[in-house]
């Protein structure tokens, strides 16, 4: 019994000691590994910080040295000089389009680098993002070298601010660069666009160009002439009754006639029209006593004298007459002096058209000729054309032609309207097919319907024969 108890105790201690040592060693190993990792991260971050700070300090020193005496020459290599006098002597062929930065770029770079180091130090303290900090630090170094690699000339520090403003200033949309124009300076000349528009766009002539016109006469169609004559014949057969004009006496009588009729009295018992009572419509009015009116002197209104605004509109002061129309626009009848050497007016009507249809009146035609119309032709040339194109015989014949053509146009319009109305008035016909009807018995509907159909078909075939 004692042996068994001892054996169990020793086995339990052995097993427990083995398991405990394993867990203890595991705990110690994990703690040491974490400590070593944190130390490594700290060392790496400190090394990165020292390298980034040293690199930035070196870049700032290089920039200070380089910005003392450096100039940019277009399409040439940059040259380092020891003194500003040598710059003027050796680099005399400089272009005016070089971009110059102020001497305060070193201070700007310092402030920028300080800000960047602060942000970088905050990022480095985070041990979990060590790899990201490495990449960011490398990118910041490269960006600083690119951004601050613009050397500055010491001779043009005063004009640097103006040039910076010119670069930042937006281009005016109303300006255009013109290199062909000669200027005092070598700089580009800026000229407004309006000057170019005036120079480039060709001014259109206000006066229209000459027009070549051919003068001809249009012949009359005989079919249209016959149709017009038939129309006039129908109008003669069925003349339109026109109301005769009223005489002056009848007008006076119509004005005196009372417009209000007298009221009619009906007998309530029989309902018959009896007579008119004047007294019932016109009520008797009591005569008022004539009041004594005192005689008052009335002031003169000077109604016969024209007003000042009408006087100011008279021709010497103003071209407008009293109704507000200029004096040259007022229609005036021609005087006897105006009618001298003027042919009497000729009225053209249906009678002349019938005479032309019966070939009693010949129409005069003008020869085909070409004219050049110009707005600035002399008056003598225009007056010479009156004897050719405006003779009384030619004007008469042209008016008859115009009447026929006008009637032709009206006839075509009426025909088109009648066609449209006829199309709309046409009656619509629908073909309705009669459905077959059968009488069948409810006891045997199918067979009875078939028998009825056969009988109908046999009757139809016999009737056709």
From Swiss-Prot:
InterPro entries found in the cross-reference section: DUF851
Signal peptide interval: none
Domain of life: Eukaryota
Bias type Basic and acidic residues, positions: 153-173
Composition skew (Basic residues), residue ranges: 118-137, 451-465
Region (Disordered) location: 95-173, 407-426, 443-465
Record protein name field: Uncharacterized protein C45G9.8
